[in-house]
Structure formats: structure tokens, C-alpha cells
């Protein structure tokens, strides 16, 4: 089963995340199938960059976003709030 989730990058105490598509059983920082976007919580306001076309493609293929990624997708306007 595929998941759309965050993988951590960045320096210690300065997190930045990639939004990736990967197998649900793989470790957090393992290799990934596709890069969908980035999320930087350290900027004010926090920065979310998502390739909507890729995100919708993978959701259409059955990839399940995690709760955090689902919130980010709604915030970016990629998916409905329903």
C-alpha cells in the first residue's frame, strides 16, 4: 500500500520536510517512489509547496495521505475539505 507522507530533511533543530510517495512499511527516511512537494514549518508563515498534478495522480492510484499531509493538501487547496 502506498502512502503520501513526510520525510525529514534539514539541520538539527531546523526541520524541513519533503512530501513523498512511498510504501507504507518503509522507514521514514528510506528511498521514495516520487517527490510531491516540500513543507517548511520554520518560516513565518509556514511554507507549503505541492505539485497538485502529482498529488492528485497518486491519490487516484490509491495512495493514502497521512493526517498531517491531508491537512497540508487542504491548506494548499489541492483537495476539498470534504
UniProtKB/Swiss-Prot annotation:
GO biological process: translation
Pfam family, one: Ribosomal_S16
KW Ribosomal protein (keyword) present: yes
Alphabetic keyword roster: Ribonucleoprotein, Ribosomal protein
GO cellular component: cytoplasm; small ribosomal subunit
GO molecular function terms noted in the UniProt entry: structural constituent of ribosome
PANTHER family: 30S RIBOSOMAL PROTEIN S16, SMALL RIBOSOMAL SUBUNIT PROTEIN BS16M
Entries under NCBIfam families matching the protein: S16
Family affiliation: Belongs to the bacterial ribosomal protein bS16 family.
Name listed for the protein in its UniProt record: Small ribosomal subunit protein bS16
Species this chain originates from: Dehalococcoides mccartyi (strain ATCC BAA-2266 / KCTC 15142 / 195) (Dehalococcoides ethenogenes (strain 195))
Gene for this chain: rpsP
